[in-house]
């Protein structure tokens, strides 16, 4: 009897420990459209007008459509990021290379995407760094808060998307 009770306690403790270790992750999958009224874009910010996220256990594929420059055609960019911290290289602005990583918060409620892009212009190299924090709001919307640092300074943009 005492041995059975000990086993039950052990199983309960292991179950509790593993459930907190593998916290339920926010469900980011879906086709999302920018809600400009709820977003805080700033004067020169360029947020994606639509985002498609395909989330799996070990990776997420993100497709963004952003407005073209000076009324040009919209630009589409797709990247697949793994959750193991591996650096993924993709094409950035005007042929530059973007290096990105993705990592879940300990509670699984936010996904943090960190990126670095290097530009060459007039023989000089500039670096642009950004950190995106993805989460689902209480009312089921996608929130992407982007903090960026470039030669022009620092900025924070909050984009809110609806399905």
Language-model features and meaning:
Residues 23-163:
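Hydrophobic small-molecule pocket/channel-lining residues, especially in calycin-type beta-barrels
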Residues 1, 22-23:
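Intrinsically disordered, low-complexity regions enriched for glutamine and histidine
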Residues 1-10:
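Bacterial N-terminal signal peptides that target proteins for export
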Residues 9-20:
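Bacterial N-terminal signal peptides
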